[in-house]
A protein has these predicted regions:
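Conserved ATP-binding/catalytic motifs of P-loop helicase motor domains
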Residues: 1-329
């Protein structure tokens, strides 16, 4: 981190008193130590004696839920060799040992449904009694009886992509394909495409975004949190507007939440007015800056350059990963 970048970050964090990290089960040990080390670097504190640069940290969540992707749980040894070396040097005074647990004993999420709550609590700790199985069987529905728009959850990204593609093929109408416009510094290799998610490396943006009118989609970028246009907002495409060159300029989305995009609709009345009956919100292609993996030594990458892309901040939303949905809940 350059002195200029560190100084700017220090100014931003000058009044930080409490850092809250939600969904702690998804936070890996490596990430926890990276947060600690980065805070110490920015605030110029001793990483061996000042946990999180003496900033109060609150971890919120349930460690019995989904574990980190490709990582060790937050209370375990880090996976990265460099971080593990630092971890071992702390002896018994690990970062995790500094936390004090506070346990909430009453579950209010399931309301008055005690049977359902008891079943979920058993599953949480890996138990399945006959009564739990009986409760779960009351929730089983054959796939042919499901609403076609019912969201499917999968563990692997490839299964998510396959189901989304299958549902798009079943949808009548013209298939529209929009290729991302990618620019990188001269002499830098263009980014790879993730074979499972079909996204541009280090991003959630599709290399080619394919859709039809009527397709279910989800925002993958926080466009405007004050307008409820957040990463994870779902809806249905109800229209497409083209530029003079007959390229898709924006898509019109009927979001599931009526509050999504109210400011955006007011900003672009020429588009939203034509789709007023759908409460349609125009969504344009977004310019996104991302890290490029430019140098590698062993398994370590150094993000020495940045690329830019122009693409719709959307993906199909007939299916999602369990990890993504846990973060949304």
């Amino acid at each position: 981190m350059s002195d200029k970048t560190r100084a700017a970050a220090k100014h931003t964090l000058a009044n930080l008193k409490l850092l809250i990290i939600d969904e702690m089960s998804l936070v890996g040990a490596d990430m926890l130590y990276r947060i600690h080390k980065r805070l110490c670097t920015i605030l110029e504190m001793n990483e061996n004696t000042d946990p999180f640069a003496n900033i109060n940290v609150m971890l919120v969540g349930d460690l019995m839920q989904i574990p980190p992707v490709m990582g060790h749980q937050v209370f375990s040894e880090p996976k990265d060799k460099e971080i593990l070396s630092f971890y071992n040097g702390l002896g018994d005074q690990t970062i995790w040992s500094k936390f004090q647990p506070m346990i909430l004993k009453h579950n209010h999420r399931q309301g008055e449904s005690k049977g359902w709550a008891d079943a979920l609590n058993e599953i949480r700790v890996g138990i399945s009694t006959q009564s739990t199985e009986a409760v779960l069987r009351t929730r089983v529905t054959k796939e042919e009886h499901l609403d076609e728009k019912a969201l499917h959850l999968f563990y692997f990204n490839k299964d998510v992509t396959d189901h989304n593609d299958k549902m798009l093929k079943k949808l009548p109408g013209e298939l529209i394909s929009v290729k991302a416009v990618i620019s990188v510094p001269r002499g830098t290799k263009t980014p790879d495409i993730d074979p499972g998610k079909k996204t541009i490396a280090n991003t959630e943006f599709k290399d080619v975004f394919e859709f039809k009118i009527g397709a279910r989609v989800m925002m993958i970028h926080n466009k405007d949190l004050t307008d409820d246009l957040f990463n994870g907002a779902g809806g249905t495409i109800v229209g497409i507007e083209y530029s003079d060159k007959q390229q898709a300029k924006c898509v019109i989305i009927q979001f599931d939440l009526p509050t999504c995009g109210a400011k955006q609709r007011a900003k672009y009345p020429n588009y939203s007015g034509r789709y007023k009956r759908f409460n349609g919100t125009p969504v344009f292609r977004h310019e996104h800056e991302f890290n490029l993996k430019t140098k590698s030594y062993g398994k370590k990458y150094f993000h020495a350059a940045k690329g830019k892309l122009l693409q719709f901040p959307l993906r199909l939303y007939y299916a999602s990963s369990a990890h993504k949905i846990q973060v949304k809940l």
